[in-house]
């Protein structure tokens, strides 16, 4: 659960950090209506991607890193685009929220959330390689982790 602390701190900063002190409350991304609406659309897209990925996983889904009995390697739907689409959706929603709010607190929280997700996905990948050594290694060669064609 090493990934829990950074995401909790990052989530707290995003949710409440701009209320904690003047430096965290400083708006560094100017409020531009088009940018705010872009953030809203990105947030909705990230949420939709998370939901699609969650339903695609079906019974394989778990909130903690574990394999279930009869666990299958899912490589279709959003998993054909990225290996960790739920994290892609969450990061998209997080970045969108930072764009809309524009406060230092969100910008400080962003790397914490990214590090937390990165730690967790590395742990998941280790487990998947142990369970599906050949299949997952081939999947890793074909599909990027969280940003299609890039990362």
Predicted regions and their residues:
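Membrane-anchoring alpha-helices and their flanking helix-loop junctions
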Residues: 1-69, 75, 92-151
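Solvent-exposed interhelical
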Residues: 71-82, 86-87
């Amino acid at each position: 659960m090493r990934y829990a602390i950074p995401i909790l701190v990052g989530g707290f900063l995003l949710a409440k950090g701009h209320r904690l002190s003047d430096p965290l409350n400083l708006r560094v991304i100017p409020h531009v209506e088009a940018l705010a609406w872009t953030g809203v659309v990105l947030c909705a897209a990230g949420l939709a991607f998370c939901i699609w990925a969650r339903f695609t996983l079906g019974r394989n889904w778990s909130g903690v890193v574990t394999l279930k009995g009869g666990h299958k390697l899912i490589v279709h739907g959003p998993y054909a685009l990225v290996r960790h689409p739920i994290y892609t959706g969450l990061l998209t929603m997080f970045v969108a929220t930072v764009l809309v709010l524009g406060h230092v607190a969100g910008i400080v929280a962003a790397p914490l959330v990214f590090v937390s997700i990165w730690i967790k996905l590395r742990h998941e990948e280790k487990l998947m390689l142990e369970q599906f050594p050949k299949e997952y290694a081939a999947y890793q060669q074909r599909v990027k982790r969280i940003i299609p064609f890039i990362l």
